[in-house]
Amino acid sequence: MSRSRINGNFLDKTFSIVANILLRIIPTTSGEKEAFTYYRDGMSAQSEGNYAEALQNYYEAMRLEIDPYDRSYILYNIGLIHTSNGEHMKALEYYFRALERNPFLPQAFNNMAVICHYRGEKAIQQGDSEIAEAWFDQAAEYWKQALALTPGNYIEAHNWLKITGRFD
């Protein structure tokens, strides 16, 4: 039985039902359908905190998925898992790869900025203000890109940019 079918979450069930209907009525290849099934199962496992299973499903979806736009979301979700696991450099790599395929993912820019800001805070704690400033400058660039794509979102980031004098 597919993982998403046993998930008790109402939203996941609703998503699965709608997705299954769309897969039946929209002309897609069997490979595309299989890729989406792995992606959907990956999201289900991820929402339950089962990151190892989610990654297995996402990697299989990546093997099958050919559409760059769809691949960007798979890569983004892999980045989320690495972020959750504290593997920040690996997460940044996956966010970059997602943005190469879809440069209109403000959430990827935001997550990259959050990681850079976190690394800047860690550098301050270690007494390295020069490294901290470099991380903060990079965070600012990513937040500016996220804000350019979605004006009005990321209000805390917008305020931080203003307070720190990094907003143009």
Curated annotation (Swiss-Prot):
Cellular compartment(s): Plastid membrane
InterPro entries reported for this sequence = PSI_Ycf3_assembly, TPR-like_helical_dom_sf, TPR_rpt, Ycf3/AcsC/BcsC/TPR_MFPF
Q: Give the matching PROSITE patterns.
A: TPR (PS50005), TPR_REGION (PS50293)
User: What Gene Ontology cellular-component terms does the record carry?
Assistant: plastid membrane; thylakoid membrane
TPR repeats mapped onto the chain: 35-68, 72-105, 120-153
**Pfam families in the record, alphabetically?**
TPR_1
Keywords assigned: Membrane, Photosynthesis, Plastid, Repeat, TPR repeat
Topology term for the membrane: Peripheral membrane protein
The record, for NCBIfam families, names:
PRK02603.1 (NF002725)
Known PANTHER family for this protein? CELLULOSE SYNTHASE OPERON PROTEIN C, TPR REPEAT-CONTAINING PROTEIN MJ0263
Please report the name of this protein according to its UniProt entry.
Answer: Photosystem I assembly protein Ycf3
